């Protein structure tokens, strides 16, 4: 078991996502899985249990949670339920799931719209049941200089080139696990304890 998977398992237990005595299957998976570590601001793609890609991200500046109007990043188990932006140019501004015709360069000043691609998430647990209604996405941002810090309004932000790559790798139906305590850097600290 990789350190990252162990970290995810520890956080899941700490957050009450794992019942005492639960058995975790370690069999390889046929489709990819996304694991997002809020503490390390990192997204990993796993295929057949092996890490195939890793990207820096940005989650909510308000911490973790799922309440309406909280602007927090929800945690737990999710599923990719829709994808938007196929074949759009990098920096394409998306509003209401539609291309506006505007294209922004990285780090364009003044605004922070959703750009390039949108990967919509649906919560699969009671603790994240509002995710779909809240409009929580994995998406591109023009504020690329801020990636790696928790600065979003609840969504998972990525650099445009990274979200294009992720979009190609994950189909609708992909399982997504978002874990962490909401304390930036805590995941690395726990991983070091186990090394």
Question: Where on the chain are the PLM-derived regions?
Answer:
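Positively charged n-region of N-terminal signal peptides that target proteins for export
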Residues: 1-4
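Bacterial N-terminal signal peptides
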Residues: 7-18
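A ubiquitous, low-specificity "background" feature that marks scattered single residues
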Residues: 11, 47-50, 112
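Intrinsically disordered, low-complexity
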Residues: 21-70, 75-77, 88, 179-195
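Exported/periplasmic cell-wall-interacting domains
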Residues: 26-29, 67-69, 88-195
């Amino acid at each position: 078991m990789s350190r990252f998977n162990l970290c995810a398992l520890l956080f899941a237990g700490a957050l009450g996502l794992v019942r005492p005595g639960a058995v975790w299957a370690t069999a390889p998976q046929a489709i990819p899985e996304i694991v997002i570590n809020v503490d390390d601001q990192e997204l990993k793609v796993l295929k057949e249990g092996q890490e195939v890609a890793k990207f820096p991200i940005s989650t909510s500046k308000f911490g973790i949670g799922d309440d309406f109007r909280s602007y927090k990043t929800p945690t737990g188990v999710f599923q990719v339920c829709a994808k938007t932006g196929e074949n759009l140019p990098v920096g394409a501004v998306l509003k209401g799931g539609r291309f506006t015709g505007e294209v922004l360069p990285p780090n364009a000043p003044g605004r922070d719209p959703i750009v390039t691609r949108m990967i919509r998430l649906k919560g699969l647990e009671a603790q994240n049941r509002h995710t779909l209604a809240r409009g929580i996405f994995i998406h591109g941002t023009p504020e690329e200089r801020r990636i790696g810090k928790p600065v979003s309004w609840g969504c998972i932000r990525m650099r445009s080139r990274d979200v294009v790559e992720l979009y190609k790798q994950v189909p609708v139906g992909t399982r997504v696990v978002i874990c962490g305590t909401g304390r930036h850097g805590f995941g690395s600290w726990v991983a070091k304890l186990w090394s």
